[in-house]
Amino acid sequence: FDDQRAWFCERVNENSGGLYWLAKSILHNDEDVKDAVQDSVLTAYEKLDTLRDEHSFKPWIMRILANTAYSMIRRSKPNTDIDSLAEELPAPQNEDREESMALWQAVRGLGESLRTVTVLFYYDDMPIKDISRALGITEGTVKARLSRARAKLRIAMSEQEETL
């Protein structure tokens, strides 16, 4: 029992950054993000016996988190404009601060579905297969969303360069 608890805690710690980014890309509000991550970790621990393969822990817990976050959105005010809340997403740290900020601003401007897969793929280095399982969508859908996101980001960044 203690070994299982220790193993679970290690996996959660290893994935804490990814859990945060996924929750933040869906919920945006820091308090909601904390609640979603906490609720998801508790749910995952309670349902640990449903994890079929320990190597699938990351997509499994990400899926639990995504479901929790989307449930929180459904329970929240129906008039909440989720895309406008994207302004609250923090910028990642990078050597080229100005370009990084411009890119992050463009990522924040993406719609929720494109932004979520972009954050998981590029900021959390999650493989397409794992994103697919975590979000409950096909790998083809993940690839299509990444392609659309890249196209939109290319346009946004070229417009950004023109204004400089």
Regions found by a protein language model. Give the residues of each.
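Short, small-hydrophobic-rich alpha-helical interface motif
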Residues: 19, 23, 33-44, 64, ...
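DNA-recognition helix of helix-turn-helix
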Residues: 66, 70, 135-159
